């Protein structure tokens, strides 16, 4: 009689703990799938598409505050170039009309660049978005984790476990699940931080663009332009990080060792956070921005 009671209690506890573990793991891997898709959706957006109200505010600030400063810089640069051009020609003794034509062309280019700063900057991010969208079809198709297959592996592995091991496993899944939620917040901060950096970077765009037509100061604008491309293509590097992360998660085999699978998932997520943080410096290094 007591054997039947104890067997029934053990069966009930086993079903309870197995259900808890399976639920935690399914929730965890579902969150991994959602996380990878959310990162792909975030990095694939342009500044105006991510938040149009913030973009409009930054553009208005740039047009009303920064462009007048850029206009002053252009004026100083053009005056300096005109004086240098005239003095280089033996104090106006060797003046020809061609050099004035080149000067006016350079002046027109400088004014055009400043007046179309945001159009040029957004064109750069459109290029980055096009690259991300072209790769997202391939990457997203390989990042989805098959939860049903994992569920079958979990059930087979837990069938041979004792009650004590199931209790330990349930606690481990709970801890790892909470850690993944914290890491998910960190990843969200990284995503939002990149977009805020883009808005701050583009808000001062007219000033470096104003220097691009000058030989001595042109490196300021050139370096800024490289920085724009670095920020735009950082999204592609983030997509590659997500693809690598999903491939690592997909290689985990729950049936062999659930404990290792749990902490392996957490370790891979920490690596993802670190990799996403490194994409900014790596992209700047690739494009030669500093």
Annotated model-derived regions:
Residues 82-95, 184-188, 216-217:
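Membrane-water interface regions at transmembrane-helix termini and the short interhelical loops
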Residues 76, 121-124, 128, 186-189, ...:
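Membrane-embedded alpha-helices of multi-pass transport/permease systems
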